From Swiss-Prot:
GO molecular-function terms, A-Z: 2-isopropylmalate synthase activity; 4-hydroxy-2-oxovalerate aldolase activity; manganese ion binding
Binding sites annotated in the UniProt record for Mn(2+): D22, H204, H206
Site (Transition state stabilizer): R21
List of residues binding substrate: R21, D22, S175, H204, Y295
UniProt source species: Mycobacterium sp. (strain JLS)
Protein name: 4-hydroxy-2-oxovalerate aldolase 1
Active site feature: H25
Superkingdom of the source species: Bacteria
Example GO BP: L-leucine biosynthetic process
First-tier enzyme category under EC: lyase
SUPFAM superfamilies: Aldolase, post-HMGL domain-like
Keywords from the named record: Aromatic hydrocarbons catabolism, Lyase, Manganese, Metal-binding
Higher taxonomy: Bacteria, Bacillati, Actinomycetota, Actinomycetes, Mycobacteriales
């Protein structure tokens, strides 16, 4: 099933740039056509083989819950496909958010790689979507999100479900940036052992603990054949592994990608950076997400609720991790914010009462 994957024989690894999908979280889904056209052209020139374009939460993600897109994603997919001369355009879809009709429309607009994402314990909800994508002649990729939350052997079982449904490459997806080196290696190795020649294995990392590049190297050494990254770390949380750094490292250790290091460095500096609202930072909030295992796209939602209710964003994120919230449960941040606000008000009232009453006098 891997024989018809878009994979040049000269590559050791196929890179996918997710700046125009994962980066949508950081940009609050406000990409313009000019920005997308310029970024696709620069990435294509640098030799990036696959460019992912969609709302941050995939097809159909433009909504009150996830955030509305400035420009309809299908228009951006079409523009990207028309702009790229060599690169293939990928799109993400989450069952329950996107629909089968969205997949068909994305293909009609020039998308050729369908990436279907589920929580890492729910691969079964993707079966019909993989079936449709293969019927349509699309290349398929599966995302097992929040892969840090279950052990390697169980993750491999979920990967088998996707592969049997028609998935040609199953990704270990470190949505929270919580995995550390051997955690990546063990999970990728487990999937490679389970899937064999039935499907490739990929890795998607985040920088919330500063390990996006190192974890990607571990993944390749464990047998991963597809790796994600975003120029300038343009992604959710502290961002994704920076493609330009990945290419520099891969060049040094002899991993062939077909991407020119200097061209991708130019693209990151001169084209992608100007489109970013700010740099993706490894700050306290991002660190808390990596440390506590919080889905990276929660960052902007937590900041918004922090400002709305006057509570610390990092406390919101830590409690989200304690409650093991997953993608799609962003609305629960409101409940947590109200809970923290009540606690803060109760503590303040207690301190005021103590100050008024003073300390009892000794007789």
């Amino acid at each position: 099933m891997t024989s018809d994957i878009f994979f040049d024989p000269i590559w050791d690894v196929r890179m996918t740039d997710t700046s125009l999908r994962d980066g949508s979280h950081h940009k609050r889904h406000q990409f313009t056509k000019d920005e997308v056209g310029a970024i696709v052209a620069a990435l294509d020139t640098a030799g990036v083989p696959v460019i992912e374009v969609t709302h941050g939460d995939g097809l159909g993600g433009s909504s009150f819950n996830y955030g509305f897109s400035k420009t309809p994603e299908q228009e951006l997919i079409k523009l990207a496909a028309e702009t790229a001369k060599e690169a293939k355009i990928a799109f993400l879809m989450l069952p329950g958010v996107g629909t089968k009709e969205d997949i068909k429309e994305a293909q009609n607009n020039g998308g050729s790689i369908c990436r279907i994402a589920t929580h890492c314990t729910e691969a079964d909800v993707s079966i019909q979507h993989f079936g449709l994508a293969r019927e349509l002649g699309l290349e398929t990729v599966g995302f097992l999100m929040m892969s840090h939350t279950i052990p390697p052997e169980k993750l491999a079982q979920q990967a088998r479900i996707m592969a049997d449904a028609g998935c040609q490459c199953v990704y270990v997806v470190d949505s929270a940036g919580a995995l550390v080196l051997e955690g990546v290696r063990d999970r990728v190795a487990a999937l490679v052992a389970e899937l064999g020649d039935d499907a490739q294995v990929g890795f998607h990392g985040h920088e919330n603990l500063g390990l996006g590049v190192a974890n990607s190297v571990e993944a390749v050494r464990a047998g991963a054949k597809q790796i994600d990254g975003s120029c300038r770390r343009f992604g959710a949380g502290a961002g994704n592994a920076p493609v330009e750094a990945l290419i520099g490292v891969f060049d040094k250790i002899g991993v062939k990608t077909g991407i020119d290091f200097f061209d991708i460095a130019d693209a990151a500096e001169e084209v992608v950076a100007p489109a970013m609202p700010a740099e993706c930072l490894l700050d306290r909030n991002a660190l808390i997400m990596g440390y506590s295992g919080v889905y990276s796209s929660f960052l902007k939602h937590a900041i918004r609720q922090s400002e709305r209710y006057g509570v610390p964003a990092h406390q919101l994120l830590h409690r989200a991790g304690q409650r093991k919230l997953i993608g799609g449960q962003e609305d629960q941040l409101i409940d947590i914010a109200l809970e923290i606000k009540r606690e803060m008000e109760s503590d303040a009232a207690g301190r005021q009462s103590h100050a008024i009453g003073g300390s009892p006098r000794k007789g």
